[in-house]
Amino acid sequence: MSMVYINIFLAFILSLMGMLVYRSHLMSSLLCLEGMMLSLFVMMSVTILNNHLTLASMMPIVLLVFAACEAALGLSLLVMVSNTYGTDYVQNLNLLQC
């Protein structure tokens, strides 16, 4: 395993750990999720370029489209929650509260 793959995997693990540690704020969770998507995009692109897979060359673009949709939905949810409750705590997203 080359150092490039190890560094990308380490970036993914650090983003995942950040997602687990800073899960109380929605903005921190969204940033960690974007870090995970970015590391997956880079890993997929490097793997496709190294293996000369021409049929799978559209997969990183599809991943970027899903990441952009996820970011747009996450930011709209962040704006809605911050306008409604005044904070970005994830506990405010529980719909079962009275």
UniProtKB/Swiss-Prot annotation:
<keyword id="KW-1133">Transmembrane helix</keyword>
<dbReference type="InterPro" id="IPR039428">
    <property type="entry name" value="NUOK/Mnh_C1-like"/>
</dbReference>
<comment type="function">
    <text>Core subunit of the mitochondrial membrane respiratory chain NADH dehydrogenase (Complex I) which catalyzes electron transfer from NADH through the respiratory chain, using ubiquinone as an electron acceptor. Part of the enzyme membrane arm which is embedded in the lipid bilayer and involved in proton translocation.</text>
</comment>
<keyword id="KW-0472">Membrane</keyword>
<keyword id="KW-0812">Transmembrane</keyword>
<feature type="transmembrane region" description="Helical">
    <location>
        <begin position="29"/>
        <end position="49"/>
    </location>
</feature>
<dbReference type="GO" id="GO:0005743">
    <property type="term" value="C:mitochondrial inner membrane"/>
</dbReference>
<feature type="transmembrane region" description="Helical">
    <location>
        <begin position="1"/>
        <end position="21"/>
    </location>
</feature>
<keyword id="KW-0999">Mitochondrion inner membrane</keyword>
<feature type="transmembrane region" description="Helical">
    <location>
        <begin position="61"/>
        <end position="81"/>
    </location>
</feature>
<keyword id="KW-0249">Electron transport</keyword>
<keyword id="KW-0679">Respiratory chain</keyword>
<keyword id="KW-0520">NAD</keyword>
<dbReference type="GO" id="GO:0045271">
    <property type="term" value="C:respiratory chain complex I"/>
</dbReference>
<protein>
    <recommendedName>
        <fullName>NADH-ubiquinone oxidoreductase chain 4L</fullName>
        <ecNumber>7.1.1.2</ecNumber>
    </recommendedName>
</protein>
<keyword id="KW-0813">Transport</keyword>
<keyword id="KW-1278">Translocase</keyword>
<dbReference type="GO" id="GO:0042773">
    <property type="term" value="P:ATP synthesis coupled electron transport"/>
</dbReference>
<dbReference type="GO" id="GO:0008137">
    <property type="term" value="F:NADH dehydrogenase (ubiquinone) activity"/>
</dbReference>
<comment type="subunit">
    <text>Core subunit of respiratory chain NADH dehydrogenase (Complex I) which is composed of 45 different subunits.</text>
</comment>
<comment type="similarity">
    <text>Belongs to the complex I subunit 4L family.</text>
</comment>
<dbReference type="Pfam" id="PF00420">
    <property type="entry name" value="Oxidored_q2"/>
</dbReference>
<dbReference type="InterPro" id="IPR001133">
    <property type="entry name" value="NADH_UbQ_OxRdtase_chain4L/K"/>
</dbReference>
<keyword id="KW-0830">Ubiquinone</keyword>
<keyword id="KW-0496">Mitochondrion</keyword>
